[in-house]
Amino acid sequence: MPPDQLLRRTFELCEDFAAARRMLETTPVARPVIYVLTGCAPSQRCVIERTETAFTTREDETSAANDWVPCRPGWEGRIGTHRFLTSSFADAAGYSRARRETLDRWNGACAAANFDWVQEPVLNPYTRLAVAMCPAAGILRTVGYDRNGGPLPEPVTAMCEIALTPAS
């Protein structure tokens, strides 16, 4: 099954975090994929790194940035086209690690409605959308980015916030 279709199916069929995690870990997929899964309880978060038939799940350092943790022989981190012909596999892994470590340092507090965490190396020439979510509080915030002549994108939309009352 294509990874995006598995994700859609998981949203449609799973009633809780545990069921979603099982489905994302065990359903065969057509190609490797990295999922970040978050529930409503503080302990409900993980990164699921999938190959077609196997998985590795991390419950600590639950951010992902286009590379496996730890790096695996035969797999290289993805990089932007501006670095495509000039970066080694080690460089690509380093860029992904830097993004992941930057995200890990963000405290994730949704009380502050800002996107100060969207900075290099998370912010890159291809950033077009930043999203902050808190399922427990029913909050979803987004900001659109685009390049305005500079080397990096800048916010070009107002922050959009959707706040729902959590289900009891």
Q: What positions do the PLM features span?
A:
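C-terminal, well-structured catalytic/ligand-binding subdomain of enzymes
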Residues: 1-168
